[in-house]
């Protein structure tokens, strides 16, 4: 009889949750297990979920300080817990998933689900172990700690201490790392480790709401000898804005749309530029690729930037002039700054975290 699948719960409110869920699911499959990834919010009320997802993106991109007020309010007051009743369809979908798949292990990458799980009948709750995968770094939102779990997985030791300060016993916290895509751990060629000389490869990942993004892209494209790739994501309007801003420089850059090949793409780069989202921050650390941060969403992303500070590689470059200057400084003296940057990232990198987490989940599932 095949063991039951590991049920992984995620939500589309930030790339970090989905990236962690996909990374763990792929690693479980590589280790011979099975996993089911589900988003009860999206599956139970897709239209309403898409509305709130778009509202979330609008707030973090255009009104980040308003988002921060909501984020902090949910940290200090039980607003989410007191409004769970409004999400009953998601709770019922979650219960249906558990009753259908009968998992022995549930791993969640979005904290609200642990509060739903606490509402399950005890005889159903006792049939599985709950593993909470914290996608925050350094500063941890209270929601990760305000409902029980059997284990908490965190990206690093400083985050473990922050979670412990919220009341979780240290023996229940495992700093395994952030479960990025297992392809980051493959022993394949890593062209981005080769010194760039004066001709670096630079990837700029544009946020749809980032003011000044196309202008930053034009600043990069104007640098002679640089191989520049501009990632515009799913929104074709972003690509059009970039092309208009580039004008005659358009032929000097590669435009990259939505892709699932980030491990191999990051492996080729000498520098990556983008906002301090949870997924991108962790992926650049895993790939040991120097990361220039254009934007830090207050509250939600401050911990990611704090993590880069902890490693000693934080660089805030909100415009083209700053980004070009930081890259040129790193390239000076035969790439001295770039080499130091890479060495610090290599010390912090845990590209196999998803595989070690998969092994833990499968051991609990046996």
Segments and roles (model prediction):
Residues 23-100:
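Conserved N-terminal ligand/cofactor-binding loop architecture of enzyme catalytic domains
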Residues 179-194:
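Acidic anion/phosphate-binding donor-loop and adjacent secondary structure
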Residues 315, 320-321, 327-346:
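Conserved donor-nucleotide binding/catalytic region of nucleotide-linked donor-dependent transferases
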Residues 123-183:
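Active-site-proximal region of nucleotide-activated glycan assembly enzymes
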Residues 190, 196-269:
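Donor-nucleotide binding loops and adjacent catalytic segments primarily
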Residues 267-277:
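Acidic donor-binding loop of glycosyltransferase active sites
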Residues 350-366:
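C-terminal alpha-helical cap of glycosyltransferases
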């Amino acid at each position: 009889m095949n063991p039951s699948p590991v049920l992984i719960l995620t939500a589309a409110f930030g790339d970090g949750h989905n990236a962690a869920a996909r990374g763990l699911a792929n690693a479980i499959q590589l280790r011979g297990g099975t996993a089911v990834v589900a988003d009860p919010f999206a599956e139970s009320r897709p239209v309403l979920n898409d509305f709130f997802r778009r509202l979330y993106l609008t707030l973090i991109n255009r009104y980040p300080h308003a988002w921060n007020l909501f984020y902090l309010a949910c940290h200090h007051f039980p607003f989410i817990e007191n409004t769970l009743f409004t999400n009953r369809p998601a709770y019922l979908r979650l219960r249906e998933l558990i009753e259908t798949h009968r998992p022995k292990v549930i791993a969640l990458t979005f904290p609200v689900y642990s509060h739903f799980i606490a509402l399950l009948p005890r005889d159903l709750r006792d049939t599985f172990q709950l593993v909470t995968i914290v996608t925050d770094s350094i500063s941890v939102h209270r929601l990760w700690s305000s409902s029980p779990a059997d284990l908490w997985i965190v990206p690093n030791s400083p985050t473990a201490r922050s979670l412990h300060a919220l009341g979780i016993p240290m023996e229940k916290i495992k700093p395994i790392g952030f479960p990025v895509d297992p392809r980051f751990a493959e022993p394949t060629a890593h062209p981005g480790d080769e010194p760039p000389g004066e001709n670096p490869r630079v990837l700029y990942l544009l946020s749809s709401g980032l003011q000044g993004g196309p202008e930053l892209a034009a600043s990069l494209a104007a640098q002679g000898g640089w191989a520049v790739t501009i990632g515009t994501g799913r929104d074709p309007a972003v690509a059009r804005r970039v092309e208009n801003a580039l004008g005659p420089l358009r032929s000097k850059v590669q435009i990259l749309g939505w892709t699932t090949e980030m491990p191999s793409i990051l492996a080729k780069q000498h520098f990556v530029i983008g906002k301090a989202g949870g997924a991108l921050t962790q992926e650049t650390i895993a790939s040991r690729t120097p990361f220039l941060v254009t934007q830090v969403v207050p509250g939600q992303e401050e911990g990611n930037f704090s993590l880069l500070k902890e490693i000693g590689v934080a660089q805030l470059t909100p415009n083209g002039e700053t980004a070009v200057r930081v890259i040129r400084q790193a390239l000076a003296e035969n790439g001295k700054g770039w080499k130091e940057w890479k060495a610090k990232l290599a010390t912090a990198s845990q590209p196999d975290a998803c595989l070690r987490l998969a092994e833990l989940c499968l051991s609990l599932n046996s």
